[in-house]
């Protein structure tokens, strides 16, 4: 992009000469020398993409930080870079291009554009079959590419290796959902476990569909970009809202999780303030909120991102503690369990669906890989490992505790065992690093809507984040049912993100190139997702209302 940067410029100059030198072939069989010719011919025609000017512009950066391990750095919201996302989006609609007045100091695109990606041929999508080879994206395949920094000091790496991509995928998929798989097994019965494997297979397939959507146009990088390419600006906004609601709901789950586990450790804790008596559950929910609040105020969450990368280790540790307690300490009733529980099977549907809520991050992982051709192998590894962990925990937990299995298996563990203390405290500590990273994308998207005359006041950003944090506390206290809330999230939101939107976007983007087999398979997945969403959401909501009324 031959664009001269200035202090008032929205886009910055691309280093064309450096890009040409760094443009190297990683997949000899997939690309011919003609790719370089196409690259050179298109360099003069590269223009800023409309996908970088529609709300939310902060999605790429915030999700990259949420799902990856960047370079460390720390600061608070008072820094000027905090205010770079604020602008008046609504004055001329959500797709208005920003003027220099609305973004006075921005000298880099809010969604980093790579010259190599822009030059990618438009015919990358194969119509011969869904899993047939296609040319991979080139924007992340330069060996010596530097990690560029954008607003909020968030690194934008384009050199992720296979191992890093797998780690990032596992870090997203191996979340708190693993605590509820024994409860899901109890709600659905042993045969209900088949739902877990079916969802795992379908989720892997829809993850591949996202890749094909991204490869349909060279400047698609994120899930909202895919929504816009498929259904216009309305699609982008709808997809973004669903993704942000899912992240917000996860933060509510963190509050409930902390409250439940800490109150199990200290059941007699209580506090009286001004005539109000707080029991253990309410007290620890409040203390958790106050503890995570300063981390949400941080401008740069890179340090937390480093720590949260240990979430995979934490999940493995908790699983090992469960197996140790069951096999070595021989704790549990060793129940045979129920073969199939039709009355509560819909709750299990949402719980199993929640286990695969990682599609919001998959496009970011794909576009950041040094070798995008390895993306299917990355997904296969992530889904394979996570499915085995989920199934193993479900079988072990349900076998140990039977019909007394609670929504989090940590609540069933005997409190006097060392392994129990390790498992519970690991479960308690992990969300403290995850919370800020999870709520930040939501906060940053709202900060974009701050009127331009207020974007330099960091107090607006602090106010938004504080309100978000305390709102999760209020929701968590109002609906303190960890398993049912998770089932509702899995049914209502995860089904949309994982099973419904990817094939719908694929069919809309590819259109006439879709084969009959692909069409039938995508429609089938959409039907499965829609039915699961309706049944699971209705069941979870009805049980929540029933518990609240009782």
Swiss-Prot record:
GO cellular component terms, A-Z: membrane; plant-type vacuole
Polar residues bias: start-end ranges: 1-11
Key words of the record: Amino-acid transport, Membrane, Transmembrane, Transmembrane helix, Transport
Domain of life the protein comes from: Eukaryota
Record field: compositional bias (Basic and acidic residues): 20-34
Region span, Disordered: 1-44, 128-148
Compartmental location: Membrane
Family per similarity comment: Belongs to the amino acid/polyamine transporter 2 family. Amino acid/auxin permease (AAAP) (TC 2.A.18.5) subfamily.
Protein name according to UniProt: Amino acid transporter AVT1C
Organism: Arabidopsis thaliana (Mouse-ear cress)
